[in-house]
Swiss-Prot record:
Gene source species: Xanthomonas campestris pv. campestris (strain B100)
Gene Ontology BP, a term: translation
Gene: rplI
Keyword Ribonucleoprotein: yes
InterPro entries on file: Ribosomal_bL9 (IPR000244), Ribosomal_bL9/RNase_H1_N (IPR009027), Ribosomal_bL9_bac/chp (IPR020594), Ribosomal_bL9_C (IPR020069), Ribosomal_bL9_C_sf (IPR036791), Ribosomal_bL9_N (IPR020070), Ribosomal_bL9_N_sf (IPR036935)
Protein name: Large ribosomal subunit protein bL9
Amino acid sequence: MDLILLQKVTNLGNLGDKVSVKPGYGRNFLVPQGKAVPATAANVEAFETKRAEYEAKANTILADAQSRATKFEGASVTIGAHASTEGKLYGSVGPRDIAEAFTAAGLPLEKSEVILGEGAFRNVGEYDVVLHLHADVETTVKVIVESDA
């Protein structure tokens, strides 16, 4: 399936690139999310006429992500969880918990922006967490998991 990208997509391409992807990825993710349109002759022509508009929109999205990244620099959040005396959590702390904690602290964050390379945290301690705010913008924050009982 051939598509024209309307914004930069990680590991795929940049704005305006014509890419070939598997039909399911295009039909179920890229097109509904507004990240791409089918590469028909009419869509190619329409894209070229609106290219400056799409580039301006992409630049504002990037600028917003960069300003959010500066707000997250040096930020940390403490999450309390039930834990045993050895420090093992009875549950786990995942992306949703981290996103909710930052949002409660006044820094809005979506769970899809939280990248946990080794999975959810199952022990008490301090962790560095990568936030993927945009295809070009990543930042690291500190998450402290402590026992609340």
